[in-house]
């Protein structure tokens, strides 16, 4: 499943831990605090568990699953992001 992860992390060390977790699960950076990945349901839950163990009460993280229909409607404005990469291929 395609997933966007957006976060606001107060301290750099916590942010580095979250980024490390996202990279471990194959997520790639799209913007400063926005990552995109393609994971199975069990991987998503494992990733969310790892993240929950490493965030603080003042941090916020949003995971957004993207269905095939919504992914097909994706628009990119401004700086061009390449969706030709294998990670971004449609289901």
From Swiss-Prot:
GO terms for biological process: defense response to virus; maintenance of CRISPR repeat elements. It is an enzyme of class 3 (hydrolase). Belongs to the CRISPR-associated endoribonuclease Cas2 protein family. CRISPR (clustered regularly interspaced short palindromic repeat), is an adaptive immune system that provides protection against mobile genetic elements (viruses, transposable elements and conjugative plasmids). CRISPR clusters contain sequences complementary to antecedent mobile elements and target invading nucleic acids. CRISPR clusters are transcribed and processed into CRISPR RNA (crRNA). Functions as a ssRNA-specific endoribonuclease. Involved in the integration of spacer DNA into the CRISPR cassette. The gene is cas2. The keyword Hydrolase applies. Mg(2+) binds at residue 10. Homodimer, forms a heterotetramer with a Cas1 homodimer. Its cofactor is Mg(2+). It holds the Pfam family CRISPR_Cas2. This is CRISPR-associated endoribonuclease Cas2. Signal peptide: none annotated.
């Amino acid at each position: 499943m395609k997933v966007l992860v957006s976060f606001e992390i107060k301290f750099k060390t916590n942010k580095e831990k979250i980024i490390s977790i996202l990279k471990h699960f194959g997520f790639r950076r799209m913007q400063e605090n926005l990552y995109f990945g393609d994971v199975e349901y069990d991987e998503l839950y494992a990733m969310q568990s790892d993240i929950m163990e490493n965030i603080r009460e003042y941090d916020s993280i949003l995971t957004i699953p993207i269905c095939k229909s919504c992914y097909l409607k994706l628009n990119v404005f401004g700086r061009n992001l390449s969706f030709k990469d294998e990670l971004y291929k449609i289901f």
